[in-house]
Each structure stands twice: as structure tokens, then as C-alpha cells.
């Protein structure tokens, strides 16, 4: 960027602000090293940091510079590069400012609140002289929100003020000039449009002092797309908690690339009808509280124009601001490697204008409240056809958002859909060296290949992940959203006993997986026939936990929430009969009901099942046999093997008991190394069991299969498979149905690589899903974190006090910054936004939640007792008289039942996968384009 001027003060040419200008490829700042994994950014060659410089655009000099202000033609480009010296208007690069100038180069009686001076050796707005690059701290951000405040010890206020009329006497909505560099980056063909060019030259700020339900046109609130009479077809929502600027940029840049894919459609009969395609798409960012927000993320948003420092208001005449709403239409984007992308031509790689709504909530009130702002506040005004939900950090792949939308366009009864989420594996898949990442990668892949297609075939996908899903807005209106928002604690006083304060601990856990509640309510909506689907063409990439503590904490919420929500859907299945689904769909819903019941039962008894499987295999292989089938104990002989197996059993039990102790008394982050040791011990035991299982398979097939599996008649075949005459049939069926299906389905899905690099890790760690993750989850059933957290940052913000204007109008006095100051402050903002990212782990406060422990204890006792009872009943000699069978016979029968049941459930998943694959292929040929 550069100042466009005549070359000096009073040059006779008027100021028109900054112009986007690229770095000279031979300058000292052009050799920027990209973080690993970003070297192949498809638009990096067009970024601010990698192109040659262009000439000043003297034609566009305006008429806004006061004669007393110097007009400079120096380049700001170098100052945007990391480690660049500070520059201020009216001075050369690296020169010290006048003692009578503040950090923006504007004369005043005191230094501004922007942190360090230009001669301090680090950039404006705060910086670390040791690191040499800018960063944003909480204190510096708070200071920048009070640009008109006098410093300690006195001084004069800097800016003049203007009077802004409140809408209906209570709603504060103000337009602010954007920095000249942002305005000039918009392609002229959009800026020159009459009637709508204001969206490119001014950012709109609204201080919402109401509940999301009261954010209505009747109460004086409005949004730009509706003000311009635009139809919103697609509302893309990004929910944010505390992610860093790299994660947010990854999502934001991916969304803008996907919007470009939609705008570039040449043969579309829909998107190109009735106006430009970009006017039918709105991107909404909802940030869950100022306190948790990474302030460097706000610098990134300010760099592309959808946020400005110094405009937010703590309250409007005593009415507390609940949400700060910014609106702007931009063509700028920042990549995850902190490169600024701007339009250069009308080519297919140029980003189109994107309509942004940025909602910065004043307090942290959870994701479900963010969705209430999205659906009840913005959704009711914009009335979109489809809403796509993304979490900050999820990167949609090319044309993924288009793929989700096409699913709704081609199926009028589709109420919700989700795409394929896969783990981010790093450059060259290097993250797969971490066993936890590999296990989660396999889990995601199998879910996308077997589970989601099966549920899609039924018509009810039990969970559309909030990180990457979509809903038809009119489908979720009414009861689905009403039930969904019962979990919002900000409605607790209004809802009374129906709200979160009136819920028992079971229902509170259910709302930990609130997306499952919305899915069930949508399918069971009275009188309607909405169904849910999985769309293979839509893919999203997300980070997964890489440490044991983070992994356990994440799964605690997932497991408890999904367990409670699954029970909720089973108990309320009768509401399906009030829906409008046809008899065929209802038949498949009943099949899915039975399938889900079986899954819940197996999940409940999984702790005992894993223990029994481990001990049975050890006894079958390790104990010596006498008589006709005499054999020695393997692998260490008759004496050592039984003793070795007994020690392993005691270690197994000891570490299971240890998990209960850890879960009841410690947080995962406080016992990190103990949990890592537990993962290692269980994986070693599982590896030993896999070796013994392989030995069993070899022994079973030493007798020719033809002698064990008879095919003379159907009865003989069934007896040889399901009878007790031989083991080969059972083992063969188990191998094919459990493990063979994984390979077959993965190859048919044309995505088999996880079977080679992730499946071995999963085989080693699969017991930890029960012995560690589920034990921790059930022991922390009481841990439900609700409540609004106050914000010190919010308290430090300025207020908007109303006065009476002409004709008794209610007005607010607001500062009126000169364009030069806006542009100068923008320089520091961009420098902070494009600085290299340092990933520093932030310490978290201890969680002292101690309620609902009695319920938790009863649940754990019931679960542990029932599993122990099953294990004892199967293996103990004391039950021989009751069952008239020896414990070995009962053990063999249980083991056989377990294998057949697991194989049966796997076959059901495979059949659903085949149906989905066939339907997708057929629909691909006949779908409307």
C-alpha cells in the first residue's frame, strides 16, 4: 500500500488515502518463509508479500486533505512486512517522530494509547523487542477502544465529534469509513455501482442491547442484505470460541474460496438469475465473548475490513450491549500463512465480494447461544434457504459448500446434511506418526465410510456435526429450534422449569451433544417429512487433539452427550408417528431403532466384553491342554506362559481401577503423564492379544477347512458355522465380517490408505476407548459447565450516552476520525495481523465444579457392578450348579455370541454403505445442475 499524494506537504493534490501496493520481489522483506504445509497455497503468488511494486495511482487523488496536514507519498508496503521499522505520516522510514506528534503522526498534547513509540524499537500497538515482531495484548487492545480518552495527568481530547441519531430512539447503528487501502482494494466495477457502493466504503456497527429473540425489524434492528432488498440463499456461519488467527484464517479463507467457486459457475441456471451470485451469500461470524477472543484474530478481521478498533460501546445510555455487530462487504482475505490476498484482475482466481456479518458477543455464553443469534436474530431477518455451520479451524475443501447446497437444491425434502470431516495430517502426513492422531483419523474415516452412509440410507443421521453441517432454515423453524434452545442458559429465567436451571443432570448432559437433539427434532417434526443425509462430495478438514489430556477431555463431552442424546431419541421415538413420513421410511426408522438399541446395549457392557475377550484369548492359548487335543502353553511354555498371563491380567485390572481413581479425582491435564502411561500399557497388552489371536487363527486352519466347514447340505453348513464342532467357521466369519469389511468398503469407497497407516494404531489402542475414555466420561457425568462469564475487557469499553438533538431527536455523540488517522492506525493493525504466529500454550484455570456427584457415583456403581456381574457369571465356577454348564462352556458360548453379534452389526453397516453408494451413483446422473 502507499499514500497517494503529490510528494510533499501542500503539494496541491488532495488526499485519497492508502492504495494496495505489493512488495518488490527484490526487497529485503520479500523473502518470506512460509510455515510448513503452506508452500503450495494456490493464491500465494498473488499475495501482498510476493508481487512486484506498482506505480502510484495519481489519478485518484481526492479532495479531503486539510491544508494544515502534510500529504506524504511514502510507501507503507515495507512497514507491513514482519520486522519492518515503524513509519508515521510525514516522516521517512525509520525516522523518529516529532516530539509533538503522537504515534499516528498527528499533533496532540500527549502520546496516544497505541503502545510504544516509533523510536522504541518495536512496532506501534505493542511488541516484543526480543522477538522483533508485533503482537497484540489484552491491555493494548483495551487502550485502543478508547481513542478519545485523555491520558493520565491531563491533556486534550484529539477528535471532533458528530451527532448520530438513534433508530427508534434506542438502537445505535453507525457507519464508519473504512481505511482507504481496504476501500481502494475493491474492484472499481463494484465501487462505482450506484446505490450499493456504501457497503464497500463504510463499515456498519450496531450495538445490540437486546436478547437475540428481540433482534427484529419491529425493534429497529436491521441488516444490510435486507436493506438492499437482496434474497439470501446461503447463510454461512462460523462459530468461534478462542482459536488463534491461523485457525480462523484457515476457515475464513477456505470459505471465501468456496464462494468464488459458486460465483464462477458458468452454466448455473440458479445462481446467475436475478442478480450476482455473491449477493445471495452471507457469511456470519459469531464470537463467543470478548474475554476469550484472541485479540490477534480481531487484527486479522480489521485487515480485511470487517472490524475496527475504537467503535464498540459497552452500553447505550445504561442499556448493556449484548452483542457488537459489524457489517462490511470485502474482497480481501488473509491466508493461514498470514499473507494478504487482494483482487488483481477479473480472472477466475480473483475473490468476489463477500457480505460479512461479524457478531462479537460481550460475554461468553456458549455455542448454543451463538446459534440463537444466528437463527433467531440474523436468520429471521435474512430468511435464508440454507444455513451452513462451520467451527473456526475447519477448512472446507474446494467446492464443498456448493456440494452441500446442491444436496438441498436436488431434494426438496432434505432438512439437514453433513459432509465428510477428516483429520488434518500435516505436510506429508507427518502427524500420523502420533498414534492418537492416527487413531482419530481411522475413526473419522470409518465413520464416513460405514456409519454415516448407513444412517443416510435410513434417512436419520443421528448427529450432524456442528463443525461442518447444513440445515434448511424453514425445516428447523418452530419446535426443532425451540427444543434445541432449551439448553441455552441465557433463557433459563424466561423458560423456568423447561430451561437449563430446571433440568436434571441427565438432560444437561444431553445438551452437551445439542446437535443430536436438533437432528432428532427435525426428523420427528409433526406433520413434516424432513430427512437427513450424508453428502460425500462435501469435505472438511479439521484439527484433532494431539495430546492425551486434550483427547480425553474432548471425548468426555462427546461420549456423555451422545449417550444421553441417544437415549433421548430412543425414549421419544413415538413422536415419529406424528410426522409425515411414508410407510417405507417409517419401516427403516424401526430397523434403525433396533440397531441403535443393540448398539447402546453393547456400549454399556463393553467394559466387561473387553476384559472377557482378553482373558479368554489368554486362557485358550496359554493354558496347556491334555488328552486328545493335547498341546503346550504358548508362547513361553507350560510353566511360564500361565504365570505371565496372570501377571498381565492383574496389570490390566490394576490400570482399569486406576482409571476410575484418576477420573474421580483428577483432571486429564493434571495427570498427563499417568494417562500417557495408561495408553502405553493398554496398547502393549492389546499387541500381545493380537499375537495370540494370530496364533489361534493359524491353529484353527491347520485342519483343512473342508473338514471343518461342510457344504453337503444347508443344515450341515449352518451347523459347521454356528455349531460347536469346529472353530474355523467362527473365526473365518469374524475375520471377514469385522476386519474384512473395513478393507472391502474402504477400497470400494476409493479411499483405502487409512487401512495401511492408521488401522494398525487403531488395533493397538481400541481397548483404550473403553478402558480410558469411557471410564473418564462416565465418572465425570456431573461435569456440566454452564453459566455466563463476565469480562474485564468489556467493562473497560466506552459507553454511548444519549442527548437531545434538534427537534428533540435522541442522538449520541461519536468521534469523527479524519481519514488520515484511520489509515495510519490501519498500518499498525496490518503489521500485527501479518506477523508470524507463535503458538504458545496458555494455562487454563482449574475447574472447581463439584455438584451432582451423588448422581455420578450411582451411575458409575451401576455401570461397574453390572459389568462385573456379567464377567463373574461367565467365568466363575460358582455358577456351574445354576447353569448346569462348566464355566469354560459358558465362556465359549459367550465368546461365540459376541463374535456373531459384532459380525451382524458390521454386516448391517455394510449393507447401508452399498445402498448409499448405489443411490449416490444414480443421483449423480439425474441430479439437476
From Swiss-Prot:
Annotated GO CC locations: cell septum; plasma membrane
Origin superkingdom: Eukaryota
Cysteines joined through disulfide linkages: none
Family matches, as Pfam families: Chitin_synth_1, Chitin_synth_1N
CDD domains: Chitin_synth_C
EC number: 2.4.1.16
Record note on disruption phenotype: Does not affect vegetative growth. Tends to produce fluffy colonies and is slightly reduced in the melanization of aerial hyphae. Slightly reduces conidiation and tends to form pear-shaped, single-celled conidia. Does not significantly changes in the chitin content in vegetative hyphae, but increases the chitin content by approximately 30% in conidia.
UniProt protein name: Chitin synthase 1
Organism: Pyricularia oryzae (strain 70-15 / ATCC MYA-4617 / FGSC 8958)
Species lineage: Eukaryota, Fungi, Dikarya, Ascomycota, Pezizomycotina
Amino acid at each position: 500500500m502507499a499514500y497517494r499524494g503529490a510528494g510533499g506537504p501542500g503539494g496541491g493534490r488532495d488526499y485519497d488515502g492508502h492504495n494496495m501496493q505489493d512488495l518488490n520481489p527484490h526487497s529485503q522483506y520479500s523473502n518470506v518463509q512460509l510455515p510448513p504445509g503452506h508452500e503450495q497455497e494456490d493464491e500465494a503468488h498473488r499475495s501482498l508479500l510476493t508481487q512486484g511494486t506498482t506505480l502510484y495511482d495519481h489519478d485518484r487523488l481526492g479532495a479531503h486533505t486539510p491544508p494544515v496536514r502534510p500529504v506524504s507519498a511514502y510507501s507503507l508496503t515495507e512497514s507491513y512486512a514482519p520486522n519492518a521499522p515503524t513509519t508515521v505520516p510525514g516522516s521517512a522510514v525509520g525516522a523518529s517522530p516529532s516530539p509533538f506528534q503522537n504515534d499516528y503522526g498527528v499533533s496532540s498534547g500527549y502520546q496516544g494509547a497505541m503502545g510504544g513509540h516509533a523510536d522504541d524499537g518495536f512496532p506501534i500497538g505493542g511488541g516484543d523487542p526480543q522477538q522483533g515482531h508485533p503482537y497484540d495484548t489484552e491491555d493494548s487492545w483495551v487502550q485502543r477502544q478508547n481513542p478519545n480518552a485523555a491520558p493520565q495527568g491531563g491533556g486534550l481530547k484529539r477528535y471532533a465529534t458528530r451527532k448520530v441519531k438513534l433508530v427508534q430512539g434506542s438502537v445505535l447503528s453507525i457507519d464508519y469509513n473504512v481505511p482507504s487501502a481496504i476501500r481502494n482494494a475493491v474492484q472499481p466495477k463494484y465501487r462505482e455501482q450506484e446505490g450499493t457502493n456504501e457497503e464497500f466504503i463504510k463499515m456498519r456497527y450496531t450495538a445490540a442491547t437486546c436478547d437475540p429473540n428481540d433482534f427484529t425489524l419491529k425493534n429497529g434492528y436491521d441488516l444490510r442484505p435486507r436493506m438492499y432488498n437482496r434474497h439470501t440463499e446461503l447463510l454461512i456461519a462460523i462459530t468461534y470460541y478462542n482459536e488463534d488467527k491461523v485457525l480462523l484464517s484457515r476457515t475464513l479463507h477456505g470459505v471465501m474460496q468456496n464462494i468464488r467457486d459458486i460465483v464462477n459457475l458458468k452454466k448455473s441456471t440458479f445462481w446467475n438469475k436475478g442478480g450476482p451470485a455473491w449477493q445471495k451469500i452471507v457469511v456470519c461470524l459469531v464470537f463467543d465473548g470478548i474475554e476469550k477472543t484472541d485479540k490477534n484474530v480481531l487484527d486479522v478481521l480489521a485487515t480485511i475490513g470487517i472490524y475496527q478498533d475504537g467503535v464498540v460501546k459497552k452500553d447505550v445510555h445504561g442499556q448493556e450491549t449484548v452483542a457488537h455487530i459489524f457489517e462490511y462487504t470485502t474482497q480481501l482475505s488473509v491466508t493461514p500463512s498470514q499473507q494478504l490476498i487482494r483482487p488483481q484482475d477479473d480472472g477466475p482466481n480473483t475473490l468476489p465480494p463477500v457480505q460479512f456479518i461479524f457478531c462479537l458477543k460481550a460475554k461468553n455464553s456458549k455455542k448454543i447461544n451463538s446459534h440463537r443469534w444466528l437463527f433467531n436474530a440474523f436468520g429471521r431477518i435474512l430468511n435464508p434457504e440454507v444455513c451452513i455451520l462451520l467451527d473456526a479451524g475447519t477448512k472446507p475443501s474446494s467446492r464443498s459448500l456448493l456440494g452441500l447446497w446442491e444436496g438441498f437444491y436436488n431434494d426438496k425434502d432434505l432438512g439437514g446434511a453433513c459432509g465428510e470431516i477428516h483429520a488434518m495430517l500435516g505436510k506429508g502426513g507427518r502427524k500420523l506418526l502420533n498414534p492418537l492422531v492416527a487413531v482419530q483419523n481411522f475413526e473419522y474415516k470409518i465413520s464416513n465410510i460405514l456409519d454415516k452412509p448407513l444412517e443416510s440410507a435410513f434417512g436419520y443421521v443421528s448427529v450432524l456435526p456442528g463443525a461442518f453441517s447444513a440445515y434448511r432454515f424453514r425445516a428447523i423453524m418452530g419446535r426443532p429450534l425451540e427444543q434445541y434452545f432449551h439448553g441455552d442458559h441465557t433463557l433459563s429465567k424466561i423458560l423456568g422449569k423447561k430451561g437449563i436451571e430446571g433440568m436434571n443432570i441427565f438432560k444437561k448432559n444431553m445438551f452437551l451433544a445439542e446437535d443430536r437433539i436438533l437432528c432428532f427434532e427435525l426428523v420427528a417434526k409433526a406433520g413434516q417429512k424432513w430427512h437427513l443425509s450424508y453428502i460425500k462430495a462435501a469435505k472438511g478438514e479439521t484439527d484433532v487433539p494431539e495430546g492425551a489430556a486434550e483427547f480425553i477431555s474432548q471425548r468426555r463431552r462427546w461420549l456423555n452427550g451422545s449417550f444421553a442424546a441417544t437415549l433421548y431419541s430412543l425414549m421419544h421415538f413415538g413422536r415419529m408417528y406424528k410426522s409425515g413420513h411414508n410407510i417405507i421410511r417409517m419401516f427403516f426408522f424401526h430397523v434403525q431403532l433396533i440397531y441403535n438399541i443393540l448398539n447402546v446395549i453393547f456400549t454399556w457392557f463393553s467394559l466387561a466384553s473387553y476384559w472377557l475377550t482378553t482373558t479368554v484369548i489368554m486362557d485358550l492359548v496359554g493354558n496347556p491342554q491334555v488328552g486328545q487335543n493335547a498341546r503346550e502353553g504358548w508362547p513361553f511354555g507350560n510353566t511360564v506362559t500361565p504365570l505371565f498371563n496372570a501377571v498381565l491380567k492383574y496389570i490390566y485390572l490394576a490400570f482399569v481401577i486406576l482409571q476410575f481413581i484418576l477420573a474421580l479425582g483428577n483432571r486429564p491435564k493434571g495427570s498427563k503423564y499417568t494417562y500417557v502411561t495408561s495408553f502405553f500399557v493398554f496398547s502393549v497388552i492389546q499387541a500381545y492379544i493380537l499375537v495370540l489371536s494370530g496364533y489361534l487363527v493359524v491353529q484353527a486352519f491347520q485342519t483343512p477347512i473342508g473338514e471343518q466347514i461342510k457344504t453337503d447340505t444347508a443344515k450341515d453348513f449352518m451347523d459347521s458355522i454356528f455349531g460347536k464342532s469346529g472353530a474355523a467357521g467362527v473365526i473365518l466369519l469374524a475375520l471377514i465380517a469385522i476386519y474384512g469389511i473395513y478393507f472391502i468398503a474402504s477400497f470400494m469407497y476409493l479411499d483405502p490408505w487409512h487401512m495401511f497407516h492408521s488401522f494398525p494404531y487403531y488395533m493397538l489402542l481400541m481397548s483404550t476407548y473403553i478402558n480410558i475414555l469411557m471410564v473418564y466420561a462416565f465418572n465425570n457425568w456431573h461435569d456440566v459447565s454452564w453459566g455466563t462469564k463476565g469480562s474485564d475487557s468489556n467493562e473497560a469499553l466506552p459507553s454511548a450516552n444519549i442527548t437531545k438533538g434538534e427537534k428533540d431527536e435522541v442522538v449520541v455523540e461519536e468521534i469523527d476520525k479524519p481519514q488520515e488517522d484511520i489509515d495510519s492506525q490501519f498500518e499498525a493493525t496490518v503489521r500485527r495481523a501479518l506477523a508470524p504466529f507463535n503458538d504458545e500454550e496458555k494455562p487454563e484455570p482449574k475447574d472447581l465444579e463439584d455438584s451432582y456427584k451423588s448422581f455420578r457415583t450411582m451411575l458409575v456403581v451401576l455401570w461397574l457392578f453390572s459389568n462385573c456381574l456379567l464377567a463373574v457369571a461367565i467365568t466363575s465356577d460358582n455358577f456351574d450348579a445354576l447353569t448346569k454348564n462348566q464355566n469354560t462352556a459358558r465362556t465359549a458360548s459367550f465368546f461365540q455370541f459376541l463374535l456373531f453379534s459384532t459380525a451382524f452389526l458390521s454386516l448391517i453397516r455394510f449393507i447401508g454403505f452399498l445402498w448409499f453408494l448405489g443411490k449416490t451413483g444414480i443421483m449423480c446422473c439425474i441430479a439437476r445442475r
